[in-house]
Amino acid sequence: MFHSKLFLSFSLAFLIAGCGGGTGFQPTITGVKPETLQYGKSATIYLGGKDLRSNMVVETNGACVNPSFSSNSTTDILVLNCTVKVVGNFTLTIKTDGGVLVNTTHLTVPNPQVAILTSLGGIVLELEPAAAPITVNNFLSSANSGFYRNTLFHRVISGFMIQGGGYTTGLVKKDGQKDPIVLESNSGLTNLRGTVAMARTNDPNSATSEFFINHVDNGFLNYSATNPGYAVFGKVVQGMEVVDVIASKATAVTNGFSDVPKEDVAITAVLQIK
């Protein structure tokens, strides 16, 4: 009888130890669902499974940096947050803190898109960070900080381009521009109709916030061995008819500036939408 009671007590103790919050079992992930996956922004990725732990190791090979698990994670659902640094495909690998592979998932980050809201309608741009990362990051930083709000398309030339993003009503230069960036004109992207590029001075590395949308193909603005060119970093994917309307507006010389629309073409906001 004594031996039977001892065996029963040992068995119960073993079962209790083995079920302590699931920590004695190998974690499994049965589903991965990204809720938000936007270039340059914080991503939220849900990992569903069993016996999950917040001390698991996340590997993305630099595609989604500073990973952390949200405090509202559970043993059935981990909420992963990280900052997206690439576009295209990347591999999300989850391991135990001991290095045992738990799950590998392939995710895709789309090219970022921004909406330019103007007094004459909306324009949607798709940007190319893989080709022009410095330029795209600079533009998105200005857009997401609200810098472009209430600026103008202040230079408009039909059959050439429309330029904006640096001045407010009365052609007052907007405060808060970032430092000039390095020219990325030798990227393979060219100044075709509907592409967007950075405006600059005669100094190739002088672009800050001003950009222009090509109204026609402008091959003479492209990079060559003898011409530094202008850095294209995206294209219009919606609203080219709005570009055409803006380009058609009557212009005049105002405060020493040429080709200024007689009626303000206001940029009310530039927003990252993808």
Language model regions located:
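Sec-dependent bacterial lipoprotein signal peptides
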Residues: 1-18
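Cyclophilin-like peptidyl-prolyl cis-trans isomerases
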Residues: 19-274
